[in-house]
């Protein structure tokens, strides 16, 4: 499986990733690191407590990583939670609505992770 094929499989934006990382080797390196990172675990922990500061911090970190890797759908989903808990911004969603959004993020992350794991196994 090529890096382009994994992006197609996971619904990522390969062209965007190339603009940022410049080389397939770099894209591959950081895409593979995503599967070993605790970035989604931190968001899960924050979701468990519904702590606004922890939710903002963990969602903001995940959004940045996903955006830089061209994982646009995942970055957009996480961005909504980031903005919901941005300090100084008023809440627009109920806790139940936030939990629904978080469940969608976790499902997208698991799908993305599975595609990356398949890519990793093909190396």
Descriptions of predicted regions:
Residues 18, 28-31, 44:
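Amphipathic alpha-helical repeat scaffolds
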Residues 41-54:
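Helix-loop segments that flank and shape redox-cofactor active sites
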Residues 62:
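An anion-binding catalytic pocket shared by soluble metabolic enzymes
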Residues 1-12, 25-35, 39, 65-80, ...:
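Amphipathic, coiled-coil-like alpha-helical segments
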Residues 20-21, 47-48, 85-88:
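Hydrophobic residues in alpha-helical segments
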Residues 16-17, 42-43, 81:
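Generic hydrophobic alpha-helical segments
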């Amino acid at each position: 499986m090529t890096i382009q094929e994994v992006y197609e499989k996971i619904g990522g934006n390969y062209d965007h990733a190339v603009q940022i990382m410049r080389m397939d080797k770099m894209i591959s390196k950081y895409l593979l690191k995503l599967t070993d990172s605790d970035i989604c675990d931190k968001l899960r922990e924050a979701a468990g407590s519904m702590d606004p500061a922890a939710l903002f911090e963990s969602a903001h970190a995940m959004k940045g990583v996903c955006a830089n890797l061209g994982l646009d759908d995942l970055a957009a989903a996480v961005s909504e939670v980031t903005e919901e808990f941005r300090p100084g911004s008023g809440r627009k969603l109920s806790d139940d609505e936030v939990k629904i959004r978080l469940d969608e993020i976790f499902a997208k992350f698991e799908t993305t992770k599975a595609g990356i794991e398949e890519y990793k196994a093909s190396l």
